[in-house]
Amino acid sequence: MLPDKGWLVEARRVPSPHYDCRPDDEKPSLLVVHNISLPPGEFGGPWIDALFTGTIDPDAHPFFAEIAHLRVSAHCLIRRDGEIVQYVPFDKRAWHAGVSNYQGRERCNDFSIGIELEGTDTLAYTDAQYQQLAAVTRTLIASYPAIADNMTGHCNIAPDRKTDPGPAFDWPRFRALVALSSHKEMT
């Protein structure tokens, strides 16, 4: 899963125009976990790719008319079946966090990597998603070691606006998988 110029080799690439450069010399030091489903509560289909590439049809679903104007992206999406889709290289600034603050530092997009899980706040995430998220996180930590101590949810950096990844996300399970994966690599 080694990155190639900021792209995961195993990921399906769907380049987003919604990104820019990080501030000078800024390296990612935070992982932000999100969730997304489009239309809300529905999985599969082309709509997440369309949102992150600015091509979502506002007439395809009533909810899309509310979000078609957004210019947003994440670095990656992990679908329910474990497929990884990457939209923005890790060394660039994806537009996933919005108005945000982590441990007193604002503008989390400047120093974070955003990974979306296809899901909702209240529906359990899949085994494949946890396995892939742990694998991607391990890869990120190898390149950006500060992430090991800085993994959080969108709800924690924008608590007045966001609730994802929600109570359905099992943080202890995720952290154990990251630790287990890291331990396996060292032995």
Swiss-Prot record:
GO molecular function: metal ion binding; N-acetylmuramoyl-L-alanine amidase activity
Ranges where the N-acetylmuramoyl-L-alanine amidase domain occurs: 29-167
Cofactors required: Zn(2+)
Localization per Swiss-Prot or TrEMBL: Cytoplasm
Pfam families linked to this entry: Amidase_2 (PF01510)
Catalytic EC class: hydrolase
Main location: cytoplasm
Binding site for Zn(2+): 34, 154, 164
Similarity field: Belongs to the N-acetylmuramoyl-L-alanine amidase 2 family.
Main function: Involved in cell wall peptidoglycan recycling. Specifically cleaves the amide bond between the lactyl group of N-acetylmuramic acid and the alpha-amino group of the L-alanine in degradation products containing an anhydro N-acetylmuramyl moiety.
This protein's name: 1,6-anhydro-N-acetylmuramyl-L-alanine amidase AmpD
Species per Swiss-Prot/TrEMBL record: Salmonella typhimurium (strain SL1344)
